[in-house]
């Protein structure tokens, strides 16, 4: 693509992202049934917490273990397309490790928080493990929110040469502005791994949990597949703009 097209496309898409995130956060704190509206200041804590969680995961993966710090199957799928299938075996193994890491982490958290878990409704355990939408039957909207959020996150990955930790601020912005409808997975491992652990915990400790609820794997397809679709789209987009 030539410089003029890049400049004009940059203004178009950059302004789109600006308004989506800017007015998105306004919608989140104003509309009834938006999670940010319902939980108030706690939503800011959640957004900051997830941003810092990404920061810590990236630093440990890159600086301590000398890894790649994808930490997200959608990111790995993006690189799979961007690199035209190079090292595809390694990339699939990375996705498996991401899912396994998420599951082990949730087991550790459940063990640490067990006394709190059994003195609260099981819905609290599920809500702190995996995502759920404000309107479950709004499939198109839920898929769209997860895809859009992941696509913006992957735009941050595409800007990785600017700074390796750009994604931290992208995550915070996405959760604040676009997370109030679906709970904002934007990472299949982050949702599916802990969802499986919630399901197994509810089965194994059914008599100890208060009012167990379904793991809802049917809805779980949304945070599993929508980010993967976003990875495919953004991988293709990266090839297009770098021709």
UniProtKB/Swiss-Prot annotation:
Compartment(s) of residence: Cell membrane
Domain of life: Bacteria
A GO CC term assigned to this protein in UniProt: plasma membrane
Record's bilayer topology term: Multi-pass membrane protein
GO molecular function, one term: glycerol channel activity
Catalytic activity: glycerol(in) = glycerol(out)
Regions that span the bilayer: 7-27, 44-64, 88-108, 143-163, 166-186, 221-241
Free-text comment on this protein's domains from its UniProt entry: Aquaporins contain two tandem repeats each containing three membrane-spanning domains and a pore-forming loop with the signature motif Asn-Pro-Ala (NPA).
Family as reported in the entry's similarity comment: Belongs to the MIP/aquaporin (TC 1.A.8) family.
Name of the protein in its database record: Probable glycerol uptake facilitator protein
Species this chain originates from: Mycoplasmoides gallisepticum (strain R(low / passage 15 / clone 2)) (Mycoplasma gallisepticum)
Gene: glpF
